[in-house]
Amino acid sequence: MKDNDDVKAVVLRVNSPGGSAFASEQIWHAVKELKTKKPVIVSMGDYAASGGYYISCVADTIVAEPTTLTGSIGIFGMIPNVKGLTDKIGLSYDVVKTNKYADFGNIMRPFNEDEKSLLQMMITEGYDTFVTRCAEGRHMTKEAIEKIAEGRVWTGETAKELGLVDELGGIDKALDIAVAKVGIEGYTVVSYPEKQDFLSSLLDTKPTNYVESQLLKSKLGEYYQQFGLLKNLQEQSMIQARIPFELNIK
């Protein structure tokens, strides 16, 4: 997209509570590189928090809905410890390693103090990088960002007052800004990834995964959503730039 001359501007739609801190940094670099060739306008959906804000802060313009949940500038580390469970069911294991950090992150035992210190160092460095990215992207000082960071979550309306967001509105507002920046008429909007038709989507569905998910849903009931969140966290890296709660509005 960066080198496609037919693409004059990019509207990046962000609707995410965040995720892997490493992935957020990689996407931040990609957006920054794209920005050197053409305007990048971020349009925020329901969420653009933590990692969602991380990848947004470098854009030329950020547009959020008044009710968007954004900010949450912070990261955390979470390593499950299943030793109590394995002891309960009588499961034991042995480890052979070359040095004391070789099995760092092993969920079969609790962290020792050295590992806790190492994880804390990784979190501290990651947080400093996050704050630095926000300061650079928003043309603010690190001190100013730190006053509104530390994981605080803001609505789009408040975020605009704090300087984290430029404009209030939806994706149409973001498109208008993109068009104005490049001064074109008679444009066509192309969405990525391209939507699949029903048949293609059905053929791409793995029957085994679908059956398993339906069985789990029937067994877990209202807890299925929480199970999905935990499963998602377990599959991602140990350092997360993610809003640390799940909203359920009824």
Predicted segments with their positions:
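Short glycine/threonine-rich loop-to-helix capping motif typified by GTGT followed
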Residues: A21-Q26, T158-E161, L203-T205
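Charged, glycine-interspersed solvent-exposed loop segments at helix/strand-loop junctions
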Residues: K83, D87-L168, D172-V182
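C-terminal recognition in membrane/secretory proteostasis and scaffolding
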Residues: K2, R13, K88, T188-P193, ...
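Active-site proximal loops enriched in glycine and acidic residues that flank catalytic Cys/His/Asp
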Residues: V14-S16, M44-D46, A59, P66-T68, ...
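C-terminal intrinsically disordered, low-complexity extensions immediately downstream
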Residues: D172-T205
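Cleft-lining beta-strand/loop regions that shape enzyme active-site pockets
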Residues: M1-L85
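Intrinsic disorder and flexible/low-complexity segments
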Residues: M122, E194-K250
